[in-house]
Amino acid sequence: MRLASVLCLLLLGLLWAGASMADQDGSLLHQAALALILPVLVVLALTILGSLLAGALDRSGQRARGWRRWVWWGHESLAFGWCFLIAQPLLSWFMPGSDALRSQRAQLLFVHGFVCNRGLWWRWRQAFRAEGYRTAVIDLPPTWWNIQKQLARLDSMVQRLRAEAPALPLVLVGHSMGGVAARMLWDRLNDPLLRVVSIGAPHHGTELAGGFGGRRHGPPLPSSDWLIQFNATARSLPENAVNLWSTDDAIVVPAGSSALDESSDHVLGGYGHLGLSQSDEILQWLLRRLRD
């Protein structure tokens, strides 16, 4: 929960900075309004910056243009604000690691990505729980430590869930680097009851990883040795796996780096990186897919 603590402190700092911008003689309502506006402006600015960077680095010509780009920006800003101003700093404190074992349906383990925590999955977890699935979440160490440390933590959680319900299938639902970790662990374990759903995962790296030491640590660059070596030997995902990605992802650049060119691929347009993990349409589609 260290990330939640950091995000809480950052949020409090933004609220304080916004309130401090008001005149000393200003009303309490004026100070409160400015306190709330500043975090929103930061979210909007970061979303615009991400869109511009992705557009400059991705020459595929598949990204949204014109009015569709503005719709994308609005949706991604809402997802960004929800995740980093509400769900991850605040709601994550109220999410237990796993549900009580009452369901006979599959288990779902939600795996977050870079600079995120379990709060990312607040809405989706409630929806799957309401459908009768047993759900679990995990907080992984920062990616820049080492992908192997993340895999060790994830493996420990998987073994615990499998031991508690050995007859139930276990679905790893991973967003971003969580999707990469889920695929790597599936490849390592070779467990017939283990299933993978990856969402917006940089399976072949992202050009934006250069600022985070992306060759050996952190989100991987396309030239990362460890990722190239893994992809060269990895097994193809089975037909019951899902690899969802969007041509408008502003974090995985180029967006096609998420593609595996397998039957598991499902390509969408109009969704940003965080929007993929917060979309009601994608949630409902995935619920239907897992029922089949």
What is each of the regions a protein language model found here?
Residues A255-E262:
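Short loop/helix-cap segments at secondary-structure boundaries that form the rim of catalytic
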Residues S246-V252, H273-L274:
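Acidic catalytic loop of the alpha/beta-hydrolase fold
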Residues I147, G272-D280:
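Catalytic histidine-centered segment of alpha/beta-hydrolase-like enzymes
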Residues Q107, E239-W245, S264-H266:
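Catalytic His-Asp charge-relay segment
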Residues M1-L108:
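Flexible, membrane-associating and regulatory peripheral segments of lipid-active enzymes
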Residues A259, L268-G269, L290:
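A hydrolase-biased, glycine/serine/histidine/acidic-enriched motif that marks catalytic-domain neighborhoods
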Residues S277-R289:
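Post-His helix in hydrolase/transferase enzymes
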Residues L109-G119, R123, A127-R235, L244, ...:
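Serine-dependent carboxylesterase/thioesterase catalytic core
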